């Protein structure tokens, strides 16, 4: 028999109790409802022993079962909303395996397929090989995903991200500027919304920021995605927010760094494509504190920028402490990508050929970047 991993179990128990406490009252019309979901991206877990949540939303008596013995549920029956802890045993085989989870309430039945990768395999993320995507941290609690819209009859990435569920904060977001995505066709939408790709238990909300005295600071800025109204709306997902100090950071130095990168995104002489990565530091030793429902407040913020023009590359980065600034010059916070990697522990632009990556990341010449 396999056991729950202690660290994840404690976290899951805490979140389970908070979810159960939010159970809805019985439906006043006497109609029994049933909905189920898993807290893992794509209903897929790693090949190691791992815990997950089965989230059950119902106003009736439910029963749950799993088709295979390598997956166990901590509870198989109950009444009303519940978050059930599931555990999978290691998968030492060479192939992915799957099992069916079934929940019934009266004559209603819902099923989910849970997939488990083979040990040693990497998470499935369709855009992991793109130039702007950093090396993934991976693991079941780090969700890598992309948001898309249809723009000019073409599927277009708004931004990609890796979201840390334990910190309730994005590790990084990444996107590109090129001719079609650097134009302005719309204005700020203020379409604040939950990110549908983040499990409910790990989402953040307005009070997580405002009640703690922070603003909702965009990582992918609203002004970064003004080529399309639908793309701009996606920048207002709460997964794209970070708790930032107000006018003297979010509305000051950070805003000015964003504006500078946006100007480069429009600069035809600088780029065919501009690859941008932004984020706040959320490793344990680089967090100021936690606020609200457990949202990490980064101690530092960063941007990594790579310009490609006629198959020639150059790169630079910004790294800035999260504090109030009364005066500043953003040039003072410009560094090489190599230096940013040392400070953040993130491997940027690793999908470039090694010789190109090494050359562009070790050098930074501010004279190559207009207005810096």
Short names for language-model regions:
Residues 1-9:
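Bacterial N-terminal signal peptides that target proteins for export
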Residues 86-92:
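Short, hydrophobic beta-strand segments
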Residues 53, 57-85:
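Surface-exposed binding patches on compact interaction domains or structured appendages
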Residues 23-29, 98-102, 115-372:
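Domain-level detector for secreted/extracellular nuclease and nuclease-toxin modules, and
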